[in-house]
Amino acid sequence: VWDFHKEDIVEAVKERIIDDFKEEYGEDLNYSKDINRLINDIYRKTNTPFVIIIDEWDCVIRNSDDKALVHQYLQFLHSLFKSEESKTFLALGYITGILPIKKIWDESALNNFCEYTMLKSKPITKFYGFTEEEVKELCKKYQLDFDSVKAWYNGYLIDGIHMYNPN
C-alpha cells in the first residue's frame, strides 16, 4: 500500500479494510470511513472479538518526513488500539516493526502494548523461527543433512536458544 499511497496512506488502509469486510460480510453493513464503528458493528453482530495484526507498523514513520502524515497515522493506530470503542471489540493487537512504540507528545499512542525485541524476547524467543531441535527433526523427516542446513542458514543465538529463521 505504501508505494502507491504515500500521501493518503491512512485513507488507503481504511479502504483496504472496508474492502476486506465487504468481501467477508457482504453489503449489509454501514461502510463509512469510521473503521471503529464498522468493527464494533461487526462485533455486535457476530459477538466475536477482533484480533488486529499489523506487520511493519512503523513503515510510515520510517519512510516519511511528513510530520502531519505521521501524526495522522499514529492517531489512526491510537483509535484502533486505545479508543473507548476498541475496548469493546478488541481481543488482541499484534504489531511488528523495527522501531519501538512511537510517542505523540508526552503520551504514548500505543502504551498498552508489551514490547518484545530480538534482544529482550524471553517469553517468545522460541517463536522467532525454528529451534535447532526443530531443524534437526525436519532434516531427519525430509532426509536432509543437518550440518549442511546449519552451514547454509547459520542461525542466531537468542536467550541461549539457537534459532533459525530462513526466508
Positions of predicted regions on the chain:
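Phosphate-binding site recognition
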Residues: 1-167
